[in-house]
C-alpha cells in the first residue's frame, strides 16, 4: 500500500488521492514499517509528528509543511529524488475533532489547507508529493478531509507471523533468525505489541552503557561520554555471547514493570 500510494501519486493523471491514512493498534510497527519500506525503495521521508502541527499562532501548523513541500518539489525537479511526507500520530493532531483535542482557528486553517492541497494536486502542473498519515484511530478526523478522492485508508493489523518477522528485523544485527531460543522468546510474548520489543532493544543498549560507566572508574562526565562513545556500545552488544539470555532478562524485567503499572 505504501509504495503503490507513493509511486501512483508521481504518475501523470494519477488516480490516487494525495493522502493515505494508515491506522491500527498502537505500538504495532506502523511507523517503523512505513519508514523502512521507504528506505528500501530509496524514497526520501519528510517526517512530521502530529504534535508539531499544534502551533500557538495562526498558520503555524502549516509553515513547516509548506517549506518542506517546496524543498521536496525542487529536489524532484533537480535530482529526481522521490519523497513522501509522513505525519505520525495524526489522530492526535489538531486535524482531529476528538473531544480530547482542542479546536482553534489554527485547526480550521490546517484542515482547510490540507483539503485544498489535495484538491489542487489533481490539476497542478507541479510534481505531487504524497502524504502518509499514521495513527491509531481516524474515526474522529474532520469528515470532509477523509472523503473519496482526498484520502485512502489502510488498516495495519499484522498477524502473528508478520509480527514475528518484524520483531526479528529489529534484532537482525544481533541474533540470527534461526536461533531457536530467540524464536521461543518471541512466541511466548507474541501478544505484546511490536513496540515492546523495540524497547527491549533500547534497554539492552542502556545496560551496556551502564556496565561501561561502572567498569571505567571514571568520574569526569565529559571523559565518560568520550570513553563510552569510543567503545561503540553497538559493537559490544553484537559480541555478547549471552545475548539471548540478556534479551530474556530484559523481557522479564519489562513484564514485571508493566504488571506493577497495572496494579497502581
Map each language-model feature to its residues.
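Walker A/P-loop
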Residues: 12-48, 71
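Short glycine-rich substrate-engagement loop in P-loop NTPases that contacts/grips substrate
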Residues: 47-79
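A short helix-turn-beta junction within AAA+ P-loop NTPase domains corresponding to the substrate/partner-engaging
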Residues: 143-159
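Pre-Walker A adenine-sensing motif
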Residues: 2-13
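A short beta-strand-to-loop transition that corresponds to the Sensor-1 phosphate-sensing loop
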Residues: 89, 129-138
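C-terminal alpha-helical "lid" subdomain
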Residues: 161, 166-264
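Loop/turn-to-beta-strand initiation segments
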Residues: 80-85, 124-132
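Conserved catalytic/switch belt of AAA+ P-loop NTPases
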Residues: 91-127, 143
Amino acid at each position: 500500500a505504501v509504495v503503490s500510494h507513493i509511486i501512483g501519486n508521481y504518475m501523470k493523471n494519477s488516480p490516487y488521492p494525495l493522502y493515505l491514512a494508515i491506522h491500527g493498534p498502537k505500538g504495532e510497527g506502523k511507523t517503523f514499517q512505513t519508514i523502512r519500506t521507504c528506505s528500501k525503495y530509496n524514497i526520501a521521508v519528510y517526517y512530521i509528528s502530529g504534535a508539531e502541527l499544534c502551533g500557538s499562532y495562526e498558520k503555524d501548523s502549516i509553515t513547516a509543511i509548506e517549506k518542506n513541500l517546496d524543498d521536496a518539489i525542487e529536489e524532484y525537479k533537480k535530482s529526481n529524488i522521490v519523497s513522501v511526507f509522513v505525519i505520525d500520530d495524526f489522530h492526535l493532531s489538531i486535524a482531529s475533532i476528538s473531544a480530547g483535542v482542542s479546536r482553534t482557528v489554527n485547526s480550521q486553517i490546517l484542515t482547510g489547507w490540507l483539503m485544498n492541497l489535495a484538491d489542487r494536486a489533481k490539476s497542478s502542473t507541479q510534481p505531487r508529493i504524497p502524504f502518509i498519515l499514521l495513527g491509531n484511530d481516524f474515526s474522529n478526523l474532520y469528515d470532509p478531509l477523509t472523503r473519496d478522492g482526498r484520502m485512502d485508508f489502510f488498516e495495519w493489523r499484522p498477524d502473528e507471523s508478520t509480527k514475528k518477522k518484524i520483531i526479528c528485523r529489529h534484532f537482525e544485527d544481533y541474533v540470527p533468525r534461526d536461533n531457536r531460543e530467540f524464536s521461543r522468546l518471541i512466541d511466548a510474548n507474541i501478544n505484546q505489541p511490536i513496540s515492546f520489543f523495540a524497547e527491549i532493544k533500547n534497554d539492552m543498549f542502556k545496560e551496556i552503557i551502564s556496565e561501561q560507566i561502572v567498569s571505567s572508574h571514571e568520574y569526569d562526565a565529559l571523559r565518560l561520554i568520550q570513553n563510552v562513545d569510543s567503545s561503540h556500545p553497538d559493537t559490544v552488544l553484537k559480541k555478547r555471547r549471552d545475548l539471548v539470555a540478556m534479551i530474556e532478562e530484559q523481557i522479564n524485567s519489562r513484564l514485571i514493570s508493566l504488571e506493577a503499572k497495572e496494579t497502581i
